[in-house]
A protein has these predicted regions:
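Glycoside hydrolase catalytic-domain groove-lining segments
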Residues: 243-297, 314-315, 355
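Aromatic- and glycine-enriched glycan-recognition loops and surfaces
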Residues: 55-73, 94-115, 215-216, 530-534, ...
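An active-site-proximal structural segment forming one wall of the substrate-binding cleft
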Residues: 103-124, 149-194
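Aromatic-lined ligand-binding clefts that engage carbohydrates, nucleic acids, or primary amines
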Residues: 523-525, 529-552, 580, 642, ...
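N-terminal carbohydrate-binding accessory modules
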Residues: 19-78
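Aromatic-lined substrate-binding rim segments of carbohydrate-active enzymes
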Residues: 64-135, 221, 225
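Carbohydrate-binding surfaces of carbohydrate-active enzymes
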Residues: 165-179, 183, 190-199, 205, ...
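Aromatic- and acidic-residue-enriched segments that line the glycan-binding/catalytic groove
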Residues: 93-102, 127-157, 209-213, 217, ...
């Protein structure tokens, strides 16, 4: 025991010495706000910061007040938000000094409401990269226009490249002055304001050298201070900041993000690690993850099964480790209205949060409210408490225990029961230096946590958090409304058409969101040309699909890959005038890696030669091999250890979800061979080439995604290499093929994350544009232009009444449970109306729509875009914001559904 105490004293001495060697923290207004190794001190008072993440851009402004009220009721003293650049500057400015396209009215209103109406401090996180499962991670789509041709980092955005930093400065110069006036330092004493501003976001996950990251952080800090930001600046999960001796970076402090799931005890150890690495700043959790996001084709937030025990336990274990600042991410998640979520994100951003998407509360809300009550009672004491060493009886193997003591001697004993099934009910004996041994009877449910407050002053002890009560539910709920019929109309393409200049993207002409747009070309063809051309070849700015009709007939895609924008139009063309119309579906702006820096829309398109066939190559064998492949022939001739994989369309769709959501292993384990690992795998297949295929040049092979890099071999000879994981790998094998069976192999090298062949492979004749076409573009669908979204049914005879199912259950969630129909148009509009009862003002009841339909598109409630409906699911239930409903009156719900090639667009039922 004496050796242990000596070791502790030595460690504490080394810890303090290390802290003293770091540059002293400087504060613009230390009398208003400052911090030390323990906590924040605001206007002379030590504060335990309990913060709720609440994104103002994910809920209608009319509902902010309700969400703030519930945040306040739960005991929070602070609220946190990201500030998305692309939300506030939606149109490309004329130049880097032009700020005329920025609109910050909602940000200013939100800050004012938080500070003045609800007395909450705020934390602002302006990026420019925010992640947040938000379109582009916050970057405007138009920024990609300025992407340099060459750069030496993993990708351009987030890097130290001068062009990126120039536009980052543009953003900071625009946004910082807006919220500078809302800083605590600009307010009167006693008023609330912004207490912290974040630079960048989770920089640890961006692949760039530390020196370059430090350069970025120094510049960002200067952009802030030059624009009047006086409150402390921070980062999250950015190791370069922790313990830095750099003159600028040492004035920042880093926070932890905790994704501990049910390993709740890690919340304590992570905070202890943070305090060791950063001994001169408070230990703050920027994202205390109490839930998770939903993904298209994956699972919903509710499927993560993180309940009130989890929300309570994370907070208490972080406090046990010494945290004096916690930000629940998300406390309120909200909705990705109008498709503003990142690629493959559902409309719901409920996040499994304590405050539900609809504003409802649950047992998780009660659990967090209990934490809030505890912090409000003891936060000031906890802020400067110290961890103390102790020993216990040996019956606590299933418990994680932490003890902290205040200057006054009050003890906080934190306990977490790690056992998943068995409650802990027993006496635990504590031995603390300078105190007589004492027993504590602990009764803790499985995976639950508590804290015992033991007062030295009066010897009283009491368990926290206290159980909280939830509001009473209404006794008489309104009956569900099952819609019996709808009106249906196919898209007429009567948009506002304008000439499209060659090579111009949609962001350059004002489309920076994820709406549907249209392209049209009218071309005169001779009889000879009709016989010559048989494909429409489209080049895109990013991996989004087009849907095409030629002379009123739907053109089929050249392969099973939905992102293959080559169409077989042989038989659809005729001599004379031909009209080609296409709908562009923006699948969403990726929030990570190189797809972030891609423009959107169609780059060019024209007619190509006829294709005899485009063959998908779906059946492969794979095995993991040594990194340095020298003798490819020996490897291929050895038939041991190979596993068969089918790279068909369903496999590819499933893998796309797995890459984003990190879900369970798939049924096809071979595709998982390089998941999350550094390594090499070899894939092999056989292709039987006929003389006709060789004569017609059907020798091009395309791998839609080789992650991270690959080398192609044909019949044992090296053909080509490729190292751009986000670009297709296309090679011509004509010089290596012969009639009959050919052995094709690709060696794939992966450094991190998902690796291998992640998309489809096809064999075809060379596809190129032989006859370029002139195009027009319409920025919106014809139905949007004609007012369908608001319920207008212009077009008269185009609208038909259809009957919906009114029996049976409509499932509120599920993947691939949509009704099956046949594609008979590119896009179809549906309109339903329903009457809602009046409700008493003191009675609040949220409404939702359960929809079962095939097709993918957007939904409008009384003219407001409430988000995106994805055919594949899993989301089938959608929040209807009460501020957009006509209570006691008639409401209109409109769906614009792009028909799927396999199921059409069938609206089966709405409730």
């Amino acid at each position: 025991m004496n050796k242990l105490i000596t070791l502790i004293l030595v460690c504490c001495f080394a810890f303090n010495l290390y802290a003293e060697q770091l540059p002293a923290k400087q504060f613009s207004h230390p009398e208003r706000i400052r911090y030390d190794q323990h906590c924040f001190t605001i206007e002379g008072r030590d504060i335990f910061i309990l913060s709720a993440a609440f994104h103002y851009f994910r809920v209608p402004q009319e509902l902010w007040r309700d969400r703030f009220r519930k945040i306040k009721e739960a005991g929070f003293n602070t609220v946190e938000t990201y500030v998305p650049w692309n939300w506030h500057e939606r149109t490309m400015p004329r130049n880097v000094k032009d700020y005329s396209q920025c609109d910050f009215d909602d940000l200013k209103a939100w800050l004012k409401m938080a500070h003045e109406e609800f007395g909450l401090y705020t934390i602002v996180r302006p990026g420019p990269f925010i992640c947040a499962e938000w379109a582009g991670g916050g970057y405007p789509r138009w920024v990609a226009k300025f992407c340099p041709a060459k750069y030496d980092t993993s990708f351009w955005l987030r890097s130290n490249h001068p062009e990126h930093m120039k536009w980052t400065k543009h953003w900071y110069d625009a946004v910082c002055p807006v919220f500078a006036e809302e800083q605590l330092t600009r307010k009167k004493s006693g008023e609330k304001g912004i207490i912290m501003v974040q630079l960048e976001n989770e920089y640890i996950y961006f692949g760039m050298e530390s020196e370059k990251k430090e350069e970025v952080l120094r510049d960002m800090a200067a952009y802030c201070t030059n624009n009047g930001i006086e409150v402390p600046l921070f980062t999250c999960v950015t190791p370069e900041v922790r313990g830095s001796k750099d003159a600028v970076i040492s004035q920042l402090f880093d926070m932890d993000n905790q994704y501990v799931w049910w390993n709740i005890q890690e919340a304590k150890s992570r905070i202890e690690d943070l305090k060791r690495q950063q001994p001169n700043a408070p230990a703050f959790v920027c994202e205390l993850q109490g839930g998770w996001f939903s993904t298209v084709g994956g699972g919903l937030s509710e499927d993560s099964y993180l309940d009130g025990r989890h929300a309570r336990g994370m907070a208490l274990m972080a406090m046990a480790g010494g945290s004096t600042g916690l930000n629940y991410y998300m406390f309120f998640g909200g909705t990705n209205l109008a498709g503003w979520g990142a690629r493959r994100m559902t409309t719901s951003y409920d996040y499994g949060a304590a405050l539900k998407e609809s504003g409802g509360v649950s047992e998780k809300f009660a659990a967090v409210k209990g934490v809030g009550d505890f912090v409000n009672r003891f936060g000031t004491q906890l802020a400067r408490s110290e961890a103390i060493e102790f020993t216990t009886s040996d019956n606590i193997k299933d418990l994680t225990v932490g003890v902290r003591r205040t200057k006054e001697g009050t003890l906080f004993i934190f306990i977490f029961n790690k056992d998943k099934k068995k409650a802990f009910r027993d006496n635990v004996q504590f031995h603390i230096k300078g105190m007589p041994a004492f027993n504590v009877y602990c009764s803790v449910e499985p995976l639950d946590s508590k804290v015992l407050v033991l007062s030295q002053a009066n010897g009283q002890c009491e368990w926290y958090p206290k159980e909280q009560t939830l509001p009473e539910r209404p006794v008489n709920m309104p009956m569900p409304i099952r819609i019996a019929q709808a009106e249906r109309c196919d898209e007429t393409f009567q948009g506002n058409w304008r000439p499209l200049r060659k090579g111009v993207s949609l962001p350059e002409i004002g489309v920076n969101d994820c709406r549907y747009s249209m392209y049209r070309s009218v071309v005169q063809l001779s009889k000879k040309e009709v016989e010559e051309y048989g494909t429409l070849v489209c080049e895109m700015f990013t991996a989004d699909p087009l849907y095409v009709q030629v002379n009123g007939k739907i053109a089929k895609r050249a392969s099973t890959d939905e992102l293959d924008n080559t169409f077989v139009i042989d038989g659809l063309l005729h001599e004379g005038s031909n009209e080609i119309v296409s709908i562009y579906e923006n699948r969403g702006h990726a929030h990570g890696y190189r797809p972030m820096e891609e423009l959107s829309g169609m780059k060019s398109a024209g007619l190509g030669k006829k294709q005899s066939a485009i063959l998908p190559i779906e059946k492969w064998e794979v095995k993991k091999v040594e990194n340095n492949v020298k003798d490819i022939k020996s490897l291929l001739s050895n038939n041991e250890g190979w596993e068969t994989i089918m790279l068909d369309q369903s496999t590819i769709a499933n893998l796309a979800t797995l890459q984003i959501a990190g879900l369970e292993k798939p049924e096809w384990p071979a595709a998982w061979v390089l998941q999350g690992k550094e390594g090499t795998a070899i894939y092999r297949t056989s292709i039987d080439m006929t003389r006709q295929m060789l004569t017609e040049g059907q020798t091009m092979i395309e791998f839609a995604c080789v992650d991270d890099a690959g080398t192609l071999f044909v019949n044992g000879k090296e053909v080509a290499s490729h190292d751009a994981w986000d670009k297709p790998f296309v090679a011509n094998m004509k010089d290596f093929l012969h009639e009959g069976e050919n052995k094709v192999a690709i060696v794939v090298r992966n450094s991190s994350g998902a690796g291998g062949l992640l998309k489809g492979i096809r064999l075809f004749s060379e596809l190129k544009i032989l006859k370029p076409l002139k195009w027009e573009v319409a920025l919106d669908l014809g139905g949007v232009t004609q007012g369908y979204c608001g319920g207008k049914t212009a077009g008269g005879d185009n609208w038909k009444v259809v009957t919906l199912k009114t029996d049976g259950t409509l499932h509120r969630k599920g993947n691939n449970i949509q009704p099956k129909g046949k594609q008979d148009a590119l896009l179809t509009w549906y309109k339903v109306t329903f009457d809602l009862p009046k409700t008493e003002k003191e009675c609040w009841i949220p409404w939702r729509a359960i929809i079962n339909a095939s097709g993918t598109g957007y939904m409008w409630l009384n003219g407001h875009n409430i988000g995106r409906y994805w055919e594949e699911g899993p989301q089938r239930e959608f929040f209807l914001p009460e501020c957009w409903l006509n209570m006691g009156g008639t409401n209109t719900l409109v769906l614009g559904l792009r028909q799927s090639e396999t199921c059409g667009a069938v609206l089966e039922g709405i409730e």
